[in-house]
Regions:
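A cross-family phosphate/adenosyl-ligand binding-site feature
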Residues: 1-226
Length: 226
């Protein structure tokens, strides 16, 4: 294993909430546990960590800078502001792909048998990392899939310029969303590596080790062997 010096790491975590009206919003089942575990693991290795998180009930890990956001637009703005200072960026958040076109200023009343909402695409935060954000460091994405796990993850890796995609099958019971455990596939440009189901805490440390090895191969001076 390469011996590492402190580097600057950005981790995103949790869901986003896209408001419909003052009392309702669109969200997803992400608990944020994997992202928070990664932030903890990076900090444990002595790195300087910024955690950008959507709404969760989790405690912020020690020795981690923390920014809380609500919406995909807010997360996009925070990431765009800070990513240029980072050596590593890990996008573990489950960011909404769509948001209501119009946020109603008052609570929508129950009228009629159906309600139609117009949704519009949110900005692609991971897809913006290389361009237009101009990030040149080690880039890691996450892929939560229900089918074609490796194929979909590899497609994301190529399209978004990632060095690594951490993929998991969220259709499997007992792992992934809401769980303290996960089963992942690390997808690299030339190969993949499967990890059996275990705690997100343990997986986070394994993922961090993998990221440190990737960064060393990118000839980052802060990740050279001592």
């Amino acid at each position: 294993m390469p011996q590492t010096e402190s580097v600057k790491v950005l981790v995103t975590a949790g869901p986003t909430r896209e408001p419909i009206d003052p009392v309702r919003f669109l969200t997803n089942r992400s608990s944020g546990k994997m992202g928070y575990a990664l932030a903890h693991a990076f900090a444990h290795e002595g790195h300087s960590v910024m955690l950008v998180s959507g709404p969760t009930d989790l405690d912020v890990p020690a020795n981690v800078d923390f920014v809380r956001v609500e919406t995909a637009a807010e997360m996009h703005e925070v990431v765009s502001r800070y990513i240029g200072r980072m050596d590593v960026a890990v996008f573990a958040a489950a960011v909404a792909d769509y948001t209501p076109a119009v946020v109603q200023p008052q609570k929508i009343k129950k009228m009629g048998a159906t309600l139609t909402l117009e949704l519009v695409r949110t900005a692609d935060i991971l897809g913006s990392a290389r361009q237009p954000f101009g990030f040149t460091g080690t880039l890691v994405g996450f892929a939560a899939e229900t089918e074609n796990l490796e194929t979909n993850a590899r497609d994301k890796l190529v399209r978004k310029g990632c060095d690594l995609v951490v993929a998991n099958d969220v259709s499997k019971p007992g792992i992934g969303f809401d769980s303290d455990h996960n089963q992942i596939l690390l997808v690299y440009p030339q190969h993949s590596e499967a990890f059996p189901a275990t705690s997100k805490h343990d997986l986070a440390h394994q993922i961090v080790q993998a990221i440190q090895e990737i960064a060393a191969t990118r000839n980052s001076p802060t990740f050279q062997s001592s």
